[in-house]
Amino acid sequence: MEFAFYICGLIAILATLRVITHTNPVHALLYLIISLLAISGVFFSLGAYFAGALEIIVYAGAIMVLFVFVVMMLNLGGSEIEQERQWLKPQVWIGPAILSAIMLVVIVYAILGVNDQGIDGTPISAKAVGITLFGPYVLAVELASMLLLAGLVVAFHVGREERAGEVLSNRKDDSAKRKTEEHA
């Protein structure tokens, strides 16, 4: 399992560097997904199976879906035909494909290398994780959720385009301003 730890760690570092250096947000999201899956592989190789599963479900699943929706709302991905043709070029998808293939080899190696006597660690139940998470760390969990929500709202407002005739609010001051702009 030491081999799996080092390979997953290397993949996580390389994918994270690509997230930071990539200019296209859609490609950066793909590398971020690979990085999160590699980090879950690190957890699995260390014997923290529950933490690895949570990493996949929460981060690589739920939060990445949130990021994809934000990119779609901001229209950062672009849906032009020429850009979609560029995405099919090998230099775009070969990096994530190679890293994913290495992760597949590591996962198959880890599955085949499991001993028949079971897991050597003490299992941690979801109830114990929940009690710990929402006991002494409840403030941190709530602050993290508020931070994610604030980031989503800010990204929406920054990326939103103003359209002619769009009603932004129902306040009296805004409606009077809108009427003067329409007559001007």
From Swiss-Prot:
Protein topology in the membrane: Multi-pass membrane protein
Stretches in topological domain Periplasmic: 49-53, 113-137
Subunit structure: Composed of 13 different subunits. Subunits NuoA, H, J, K, L, M, N constitute the membrane sector of the complex.
Family: Belongs to the complex I subunit 6 family.
Cytoplasmic side stretches: 22-27, 75-91, 159-184
Domain of life: Bacteria
Pfam short name (any one): Oxidored_q3
UniProt KW keywords: Cell inner membrane, Cell membrane, Membrane, NAD, Quinone, Translocase, Transmembrane, Transmembrane helix, Ubiquinone
InterPro entries: NADH_UbQ/plastoQ_OxRdtase_su6, Nuo/plastoQ_OxRdtase_6_NuoJ
Subcellular location: Cell inner membrane
Enzyme class: translocase
GO biological process: respiratory electron transport chain
EC numbers: 7.1.1.-
Keyword Membrane: yes
Alphabetical list of PANTHER family matching this protein: NADH-UBIQUINONE OXIDOREDUCTASE CHAIN 6
Protein name: NADH-quinone oxidoreductase subunit J
GO MF term set: NADH dehydrogenase (ubiquinone) activity; quinone binding
Predominant localisation class: membrane
Known role: NDH-1 shuttles electrons from NADH, via FMN and iron-sulfur (Fe-S) centers, to quinones in the respiratory chain. The immediate electron acceptor for the enzyme in this species is believed to be ubiquinone. Couples the redox reaction to proton translocation (for every two electrons transferred, four hydrogen ions are translocated across the cytoplasmic membrane), and thus conserves the redox energy in a proton gradient.
Ranges annotated as spanning the membrane: 1-21, 28-48, 54-74, 92-112, 138-158
Keyword Translocase: yes
